Amino acid sequence: MMEGHMLFFLLVVVVQFLTGVLANGLIVVVNAIDLIMWKKMAPLDLLLFCLATSRIILQLCILFAQLGLSCLVRHTLFADNVTFVYIINELSLWFATWLGVFYCAKIATIPHPLFLWLKMRISRLVPWLILASVVYVTVTTFIHSRETSELPKQIFISFFSKNTTRVRPAHATLLSVFVFGLTLPFLIFTVAVLLLLSSLWNHSRQMRTMVGTREPSRHALVSAMLSILSFLILYLSHDMVAVLICTQGLHFGSRTFAFCLLVIGMYPSLHSIVLILGNPKLKRNAKTFIVHCKCCHCARAWVTSRNPRLSDLPVPATHHSANKTSCSEACIMPS
């Protein structure tokens, strides 16, 4: 029988999974449609597309791990593929790191020759950075192919057996490689984000001293800083918990262990929502999707109220009028 708190955490993980898949799925679909229509993809869109795709796969893995830890599926199935999960997680971290570097290069104002060089070339470097990340993660994983398959499996299975010993000293070096793989992108990301926050803070101070500065401009600047700060906090929490789990510093079945799983799943879902809210194109498409769903729901409810036998029939797609009637107005139908 599953304990009450484990059942609660499992339900929260499922909600995180659905939220993350919807948010990341929206990013993937919007950018894929643009690629089909225009036969090309902007550097930022390419980064978002790769990041969202890796996060969808990662959240599937997190959900499957939670099911295994809850004894709803055989944990050995996940243990046999835990190296793949590590690769996807590290790729996701690298893509998020390059996203932070891209924002820093495009937004920050730093009078340094190296930064100016990066600012001029970051758009052309994005595809190469993505390719380099894939090659780096793949090569570093398969250099120690046997150990990288045994160590994560040992860590995962140790959560189920009290007789399983912790990581052997012979694996201590390899464990440090795992931790280094998580730490390196975090250090690059932290430097980029701190430079960006410093630049935005200096710009905010200049705006305060300027006469006639518009309030919306200040609000947009504060929103950008909060968005970047939330990015940093989520990234940091995800990295810390991942390192803690790798070092087997948690007791399986405890509330702390379950909470750490929630933190790991929180990063790819919540940050994708932050990305949507901060990107005008994604935000516009998200609003269109929500309005369309509401209109379809209202139309189905009206049809069902008029004739319950028609409740199983599909509702045809609705088209907005020229004056863009809101969903609430469209739902006011004569009885």
UniProtKB/Swiss-Prot annotation:
Residues 29-43, 103-124, 198-224, 278-335 are cytoplasmic. Residues 1-7, 65-81, 146-176, 246-256 are extracellular. It is found in: Membrane. Glycans are attached at N81, N163. The keyword Lipid metabolism does not apply. GO terms for molecular function: bitter taste receptor activity; G protein-coupled receptor activity; taste receptor activity. Its main location: membrane. Belongs to the G-protein coupled receptor T2R family. Several bitter taste receptors are expressed in a single taste receptor cell. This is Taste receptor type 2 member 119. It comes from Mus musculus (Mouse).
